[in-house]
From Swiss-Prot:
Domain of life: Archaea
Pfam families per record: GATase (PF00117)
List of catalytic residues: 76, 163, 165
PANTHER family, per database record: GMP SYNTHASE [GLUTAMINE-HYDROLYZING], GMP SYNTHASE-RELATED
Protein name: GMP synthase [glutamine-hydrolyzing] subunit A
Enzyme Commission code: 6.3.5.2
PROSITE patterns, per database record: GATASE_TYPE_1
Gene, per the UniProt record: guaAA
GO molecular function, one term: GMP synthase activity
Amino acid sequence: MIVILNNGGQYVHRIQRSLKYLDVPAKIIPNSTTLEEIIADSEIKGIILSGGPDITKATNCENIALNSELPVLGICLGHQLISKAYGGEVSRADSEEYASIKIYVKEENDLFNGVPSEFTAWASHMDEVKVIPDCFEVLAYSDICGIESIKHKEKSIYGVQFHPEVSHTEYGDVILKNFCKKCGFEFEE
């Protein structure tokens, strides 16, 4: 099972539904849930930090990003929280948008395996990661944001500024499936 920490984003149920379409069991839990409570359930194989409107209300997400040995995927606000937890900089976007944008994948990697080097995604840019921590690398960027996706250099921790769970994002299901593979789920190809 994958747990989705609910940071109050409008697409949190869409994340769960997208995982259901992939036949991956998922459960939405409050963002006040501790890492200890999560790892006490041996069926949990991965964690998604959802988007949301307010970084100050994302209670335990930074601690989970720092200390989880389970794979973690941060979406939108979740992506920002991961970066912030490791010492990255998050601030207002230069171009505040909520729109369809072109994403450019720097090179094929485990999160974007099977995804073309350029695709369209639905993204929210009110706040964004401005500087990544030293232990992360940039996986993808756009014309309006130089850091659309990141990965920890040693752990299975990923962040995406855009929303792979919505139908407007091309290959969003592939990106989510790739994360689920990192969590140990297998799929017929």
